Amino acid sequence: MTRTILIASGKGGVGKTTLTSNLAYALTQLGENVIAVDANLTTPNLGLHFGMHLAPRTLQDVLKGKIRLDKAMYTHPYGFRFIPASISTRDLAGVDVGRLQNVMLGLTGKADYVLMDCAAGLGREATSAIAAADEILLVTNPDLPSVADALKAAEVARGMNKDIIGVVVNRTKGKRHELGIGAIRELLEVPVIAQIPEDRMVAESIAAKRPIMDYASDSPAAVEILKLAAKLSGRRLKASSTNVSVLRRLINWMRR
């Protein structure tokens, strides 16, 4: 069964694209068949994270009816497949975002996981992505503006009868001014399923166009993303460690 999961936030800059790219890698490392989709048509960045931002055929071409969906799908060297969006504003002309839901149905049965990144905010582009997904994974930073926007996204998703599987609290620093996990859970009325700490290695990995789990697999953020991927796939970690050799052994064990 294919799980189509939209990584959504309501607010830009909280790290949902970074999380999407790293989950695609992590789930693939765990032996899952993954397709990542950049459904952010106006300001796409997922291709930049993957080093595949100059693809000749994109989701915009599919939404214009120019090509079939499979013609805009590429296999990344890390093993997952990727459907990019064009970074050129000229390619927005003639795009029918209302077709996104039907287009995404074409991926049913072709992967274990379809991970969608989408535009920030709650405009038609973002709501079309919500409509096209089966499940929603919220991402927020531990501050009130981020959580408030995540709440708006949650309300839209609930209005469409979408299953919100949880919220990821990203870039935590352990500071007194941050909203606590209990407060975030109470405000959003969804479980907090991961806390990813602020980690300077994440910015370095983005610049290198490599997932943090590949670039610095022993970093705190990489370990938490692996835990999240394991939780999404229903796997249980035997142990937890920031030691790279132990982390690799965990991945190898879970792929059996």
PLM segments and residue spans:
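NTP-binding/hydrolysis catalytic cores, primarily Walker-type P-loop NTPases
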Residues: I212-R256
